[in-house]
Curated annotation (Swiss-Prot):
The active site is at H264. Belongs to the LpxC family. GO terms for biological process: lipid A biosynthetic process. It catalyses: a UDP-3-O-[(3R)-3-hydroxyacyl]-N-acetyl-alpha-D-glucosamine + H2O = a UDP-3-O-[(3R)-3-hydroxyacyl]-alpha-D-glucosamine + acetate. Its cofactor is Zn(2+). The gene is lpxC. One of its GO terms (cellular component) is membrane. NCBIfam families: lpxC. One of its GO terms (molecular function) is metal ion binding. Zn(2+) binds at H78, H237, D241. Keywords: Hydrolase, Lipid A biosynthesis, Lipid biosynthesis, Lipid metabolism, Metal-binding, Zinc. This is UDP-3-O-acyl-N-acetylglucosamine deacetylase. InterPro entries: Ribosomal_Su5_D2-typ_SF, UDP-acyl_GlcNac_deAcase, UDP-acyl_GlcNac_deAcase_C, UDP-acyl_N-AcGlcN_deAcase_N.
């Protein structure tokens, strides 16, 4: 049986919020079978638990934001991406602010944190959402689409008219049957343009942003002295984001995802469209791990090993 997974022990870290610039304490705790990923604002007078779900995403302008009873947790996509890549089904995420810390701007720190805690299989079948009919959302020339596929693959195209991005490639296709999330995707950092960062700071945003947690570009080049971690780091980060955005649906998807210039809003709209049509998906489990898609039939640390 392909089993659900959580972490073995509690782990903690401290970072800063990308937009607030304030210190944030993050604690990951094991959770029982069928709990899902649950975020908890433990800094509030009465802590608020917000289970990750497509319908709980209330703001997607700058990040994916979970909202419930007036409480919010922002910038969840990198941590959710790490959970997807490591096959974590159940987890409590305690946070002392309304933002998940940005860490180094990638999912790498969260992968390290989860692996440090250890991963434990649970005595319950892992549930998948198997897409059975195509679902698509469009917004002008942008689109995001899910098609039936026995596995999980993504094809993402960005369109940033910038010399440094042009040089590294604007499109990427990955099938996790033969690609390692941890090695090939997890370390791709978020990126921004210097003039946009200044504008955002004037609006009280991006106060925690720096070259320690983002790739920063001027009109012509990358400003970070250490350059890129991957030749195609820009499009890989957008794929990393998409993996995290899609994982809020509650279970891993068995599907092929195709997107052009998609972002948090379009990704969430795609999930809502999927869930609105019950004939377009089914929940499946695998009693025989050998019959599960490659990439999920793992025996070791990661889902997309």
């Amino acid at each position: 049986m392909l089993k659900q997974r959580t972490i073995k022990q509690i782990v903690k870290t401290v970072g800063i919020g990308l937009h607030s610039g304030r210190k944030v304490e993050l604690t990951l705790r094991p959770a029982g079978p069928d709990t899902g990923i649950v975020f908890s604002r433990v800094d509030l007078a009465t802590p608020v638990d917000i289970p990750a779900s497509a319908m709980a995403i209330g703001d997607t302008r700058l990040a994916s934001v979970l909202q419930k009873d007036g409480a919010r947790v922002s910038t969840i996509e990198h941590l959710m991406s790490a959970c997807a890549g490591l096959g974590i089904d159940n987890l409590y995420v305690d946070v002392t602010a309304e933002e998940i810390p940005i860490m180094d701007g990638s999912a790498g720190s969260f992968v390290f944190l989860i692996q440090s805690a250890g991963i434990e299989e649970q005595n319950a079948a892992k549930k998948f959402i198997k897409v059975t009919k195509p679902v698509e959302i469009r917004d002008g020339d942008k689109f995001a689409r899910l098609d039936p596929y026995f596995g999980f693959k993504l094809k993402f195209t960005i369109d940033f008219r910038h010399p440094a991005v042009d040089k590294t490639g604007q499109a990427l296709e990955v099938d996790f049957a033969n690609t390692s999330y941890v090695r090939e995707i997890a370390r791709a950092r978020t990126f921004g343009f210097a003039h946009e960062v200044e504008m955002m700071r004037e609006l009280g945003l991006a106060r925690g942003g720096s070259m320690d947690n983002a790739i920063v570009l001027d009109e012509y080049r990358i400003l970070n002295n250490d350059g890129l971690r991957y030749d195609d780091e820009f499009v890989k980060h957008k794929m990393l984001d998409a993996i995290g955005d899609l994982y809020v649906v509650g279970h891993p998807l068995l599907a092929s995802y195709t997107a052009y210039k998609s972002g948090h809003g379009l990704n969430n709209a795609l999930l809502r469209e999927l869930l609105a049509h019950e004939d377009s998906y089914e929940i499946v489990t695998f009693d025989d791990t050998q019959k599960a898609p490659r990439g999920f039939a793992y025996e070791t640390q990661t889902a997309f090993a």
